[in-house]
Amino acid sequence: MPSQMEHAMETMMLTFHRFAGDKDHLTKEDLRVLMEREFPGFLENQKDPLAVDKIMKDLDQCRDGKVGFQSFLSLVAGLTIACNDYFVVNMKQKGKK
């Protein structure tokens, strides 16, 4: 029986390939749709309407208009780290009360 972590890994792979389709990469439009559907809270909290464009620029290291799986994982990892930092701060504040 797969562990929770194995399910999480499978979810990341399936999500990437669902939005990439038959390709082995995400286009800017693929990334925009993925972000809107899978990270709606993140985009809603962005004050910059060009947030997806900036994320694409950061992730597209080859400057070919494509984001591969490794770069996608970097995005997920970065968002997870930011969420964890927020979580830890809130847990510490709750502990002080």
UniProtKB/Swiss-Prot annotation:
Q: Which GO terms describe its molecular function?
A: calcium ion binding; protein homodimerization activity; transmembrane transporter binding
Record-level GO BP terms: membrane raft assembly; mRNA transcription by RNA polymerase II; positive regulation of exocytosis; positive regulation of focal adhesion assembly; positive regulation of plasma membrane repair; positive regulation of plasminogen activation; positive regulation of stress fiber assembly; positive regulation of substrate adhesion-dependent cell spreading
Q: Which residues form a coiled coil?
A: none
Keyword list, A-Z = Acetylation, Repeat
**Region (Ancestral calcium site) spans which residues?**
60-71
- Which Pfam family is one of those matched by this entry? S_100
Quaternary structure and partners: Heterotetramer containing 2 light chains of S100A10/p11 and 2 heavy chains of ANXA2/p36. Interacts with SCN10A. Interacts with TASOR.
**Other noteworthy facts:** Does not appear to bind calcium. Contains 2 ancestral calcium site related to EF-hand domains that have lost their ability to bind calcium.
Q: What name appears for this protein in its UniProt entry?
A: Protein S100-A10
Q: Which organism is it from?
A: Mus musculus (Mouse)
